[in-house]
């Protein structure tokens, strides 16, 4: 962030709280901005190529070479995805408290390469088993242990990589400079654009290799991609801005002290609190009066906290209602790599007489719609909205997220209607008892729900990224992005829990469950209608919470 009047010998403005790779004050003209962000977005493209090379087709590997049932495989995918989305909390803690973002990215990249290498070796172990109805695999025990150990090592590596790379990229822009502040908002759009470009390449190339050539090769290529990501990251070292961490207390300790002090001072009178507020110069506003019970931490009786520390603690606490009301959106988001993929496997997938599209490749329509829509959103819709609202982002971050949640509700309605059509077609052609038969219904029927998912992500996903980066204290921005990712971690676990409960409840008395291995006897349409109802309730809850949200005070010093 810039300091007025701070210049080098050539008259180039310097930046405070940031240094260059030589540990000297960063010079604005030769560091940061898009020159640095380009390298970091390149790293994200390669990393997402590697990650989705594993996750996008994971359910096919589990139900194929490892021989798990559909319900068991979906539960395992959700459990792993949930873990991968929660581990960024650990990675962000390590980065913001100890290593810093850049060093954490380096360590996570090395761990990533090791995990993907072991995963490749596990796929080379021969396996010959039929589909199991148990939650365990029928593959050789050593293969299963090696595979899942490597899989969760990849999740751990992703936990250190994901929040730090994005926060490190956003750190390259000075939010107090109007032009760089505007560029930072665009950075989140183009970051997601790059991420989806990497995902799109994975879905068209790697999924075909995994389904038709070799799983070992399909897992080995992501390992090579992570080596490339590490090289690209190092190439940009000379251009990066590195944030300087304060040498006093950890931000976690400072925030924790506020909560502890407020509890210790719980019995102090309102007059004492008012006196402390006046003594410290706390301005009465909506921000200061929200969570006013924390203002008791300002009373010197049992340990006083500063106003800045109080605001840090409040800014974290304000995120909780938004976080909670977005969980249903995360449950909906978890369905595309699981049941959507299994649906596609039952449908007519021929493009040419000799080529069938991989079911997992259908997920590419999510990325494709994002790649197409983000430039339209960033270059057309936002300037139009900006001319009316005079806001740098055109619309607020909360409005953007709410629009995405509404679109996720529409996506589940469309998914339910399409599945009803697929089941009717299977019944009309007498294929209800033929799980291996191809339902004479084009797989392109699934495209609208995938496209809606993509447009939903442009609004909700990118909005959540920017919101959780922007609304936390500066020193906790890796944690802010980890909190955003944890929404999807908990969402995946909730999805897995729902699947397990519904599987047990609907398979009693020998009846086919909603998630039967034979999808022509299953009722995924019921599950999608349930998610649509939950999405509507989640949207209503979100709108109620967002209406009363108080934004973080901007430090103008």
From Swiss-Prot:
PROSITE patterns: PTR2_1 (PS01022). It is found in: Membrane. GO terms for cellular component: membrane. The keyword Transmembrane helix applies. Keywords: Membrane, Phosphoprotein, Transmembrane, Transmembrane helix, Transport. Pfam families: PTR2 (PF00854). The modification Phosphothreonine is found at residue 104. PANTHER family: OLIGOPEPTIDE TRANSPORTER-RELATED (PTHR11654). Belongs to the major facilitator superfamily. Proton-dependent oligopeptide transporter (POT/PTR) (TC 2.A.17) family. This is Protein NRT1/ PTR FAMILY 5.10. It comes from Arabidopsis thaliana.
